[in-house]
Amino acid sequence: MARRQRRRLLQLMAIGLGVLLGRPVLATTSRRPLGPISAGQRTLITEFLLVHTQLLAGYVLSGADGQANHATLDSLRRQGDGLMQRIKRELFTRIERGEMAQLEARWRTVADATRTRPTLDIARLMLPMAQEVAAPLGALLPPVDIKAAGGNEGRARRRLLMSQLLLDGVSACWSQDLTHWDQMDERRVMLEKWLNAVAQQGTGGVRLLAQWNLFASALPLRNAHCLPGAAHTLQSVGERLYKLL
């Protein structure tokens, strides 16, 4: 029964991915011109994206080391469900109704996939769809402002980059065939530039750089094997660094 359910899930995800590849990326669809989002909306988006990333990283990490923390994954799914309901209520003027329905359906598919025994087949189908969950929400956030290193402007975007980089690294440690190496390198360079700018201002920069250096040293190089324990280092240090950004 479990094998049949897993096969069916793979089929559904393959169909969903095929639909995604045959249509424009959700993040590029039209949004109503309402000006910048509020601080509360930025916080809501980043909270959801963090839970979203923690869930995916936890699933991928359990596949890498063969040990799944089901209680933690269950808790993250519940948190994600609650935050998604808030997103539907608070961002309905930003995302069209049909697009919001697609966003919720994709989140549900990804969340359901994390209930299965981790396999590379599921992960390879799940991760692109997970990006389609994050993309339209990330598109609402302000751009990273390297010059305004000490301010709050762009903080949500930096946290999004951090969460994406965390997922990239953990995924690469498991599958060793990450298809978005260039994107991971771009995120790494952008965050490093911002952290160096913060360090020059001397406000918490030393602590940030210390955590970043630990995180960056665990990131896999292109098509290279991860160091022993690197996936766990990426997850623990990445989540700590996320909170400091």
Residue ranges and their predicted role:
Residues 2, 8-27:
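N-terminal export signals
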Residues 6-7, 162:
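Generic secondary-structure microfeatures
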Residues 22, 63, 98, 115-117, ...:
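Short, flexible coil/linker elements and helix-boundary hinge sites characteristic
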Residues 25-47, 67-74, 94-97, 120-124, ...:
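Short, solvent-exposed segments of well-ordered alpha helices
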Residues 35-68, 149-177, 235-243:
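N-terminal extracytoplasmic segments of bacterial inner-membrane proteins
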Residues 70-132, 190-244:
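Heptad-repeat alpha-helical coiled-coil/4-helix-bundle sensor or tether segments in soluble regions
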Residues 118-206:
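Extended amphipathic alpha-helical interaction segments
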